[in-house]
């Protein structure tokens, strides 16, 4: 929050009434005047925390560990010649810029949930992708995540972040999350419902957060949240884990939503205690075991997290779905074999797991657990496009995709060229790479910077042709080293 931002007096009065006895409203108001500390989360699908810390130190970044997320750090940049979002670490998917409190729901989920290679997880309100990518890293890119987003304008950003982070176990859907309980009852091993809310905890980063604040709007939002948590509960398997979270502070949107569910199904749910989630979690623990994060306690956003276990199954009347035609088919065995032979000969990679599907000339890799859901949902995007087919007969072949190399590139040692900082900048700016020794390279080549693959090129006589998708090109103000 900026110091000029005014907190409505009605809001201050309300917060005074619900503030725990050990906290002071003056401290709450004061912390709301201070800028929010920036934070990042290391993407362990691409780099270890230890190796990232070394890179950060070389950059002059000061990292302070976030207690509830082993991969999370508050970050201070001593010099900032370029935005953090244009750093090589961010562009290459090695880290995700994410507020510290928003790392809590996923940490809470995996405090109680141990995934398998067949686990199916729903992120009910997924955009822009911070929690979806965090879940994927915790699942080590295995199993299946349904990343649902109701806002059509945010689906593109969600996909861009999933692609940048090298994630291959996500299927994207575009529905009102209230449909999942009737459409897919008892389906998910775990569900994250980071519910839409009034955003009372976000005033430190959004000076407009309180412009439309009112008790009537809170009541209206809470009604939607009740419907969302009911749907999530029905979609959850018996013994499944549901995490309910918001970035707001009012009880109507937090504790009261959990009590609403408990009152509806007193014999079917159990509140799980989050006191042992991290050191000092008890400072924000409620009597029920929820975490109600006041911003002055950890110098963070305001937040709420509850962990709920479904202890007993219950029935729900299924709804009629209109799915439309599924646009993919399984390729022939010959084509599948030809594709994998191409990858083996060009990149010496043979450990590609998943189900191969085809749409026109495109070849896609789907996560194995998706199979029973293919006829149950309409997907906005499913799996990753790994190649495109071209030509006919002897002149036919395959072209790899940017998605393929972001997901598999760091596990490939063959046919890889290391770029300098200047060459990596040129690549992100969409330019071809010249003045590079590419002798011995033919056709497609992986391009890496500081040991991590950042994209794909094609070796020609005097240059490497850039294959970066147009929508990912950055024109200026990129990293210096």
From Swiss-Prot:
Keywords: Cytoplasm, Methyltransferase, RNA-binding, rRNA processing, S-adenosyl-L-methionine, Transferase
CDD domains tied to this protein: AdoMet_MTases
UniProt-annotated binding residues for S-adenosyl-L-methionine: 125-131, 149, 176, 194
Cell location: Cytoplasm
Record-level GO BP terms: rRNA base methylation
GO molecular function, a single term: rRNA (cytosine-C5-)-methyltransferase activity
Catalysed reactions, semicolon-separated: cytidine(1407) in 16S rRNA + S-adenosyl-L-methionine = 5-methylcytidine(1407) in 16S rRNA + S-adenosyl-L-homocysteine + H(+)
Residues annotated as the enzyme's active site: 247
Pfam families, sorted: Methyltr_RsmB-F, Methyltr_RsmF_N, Methyltranf_PUA, YebU_pre-PUA_dom
NCBIfam families found in the cross-reference section: nop2p (TIGR00446), PRK11933.1 (NF008898)
Protein function: Specifically methylates the cytosine at position 1407 (m5C1407) of 16S rRNA.
Record family assignment: Belongs to the class I-like SAM-binding methyltransferase superfamily. RsmB/NOP family.
PANTHER family listed in its UniProt record: 28S RRNA (CYTOSINE(4447)-C(5))-METHYLTRANSFERASE-RELATED, NOP2 YEAST -RELATED NOL1/NOP2/FMU SUN DOMAIN-CONTAINING
Name of protein: Ribosomal RNA small subunit methyltransferase F
Organism: Psychromonas ingrahamii (strain DSM 17664 / CCUG 51855 / 37)
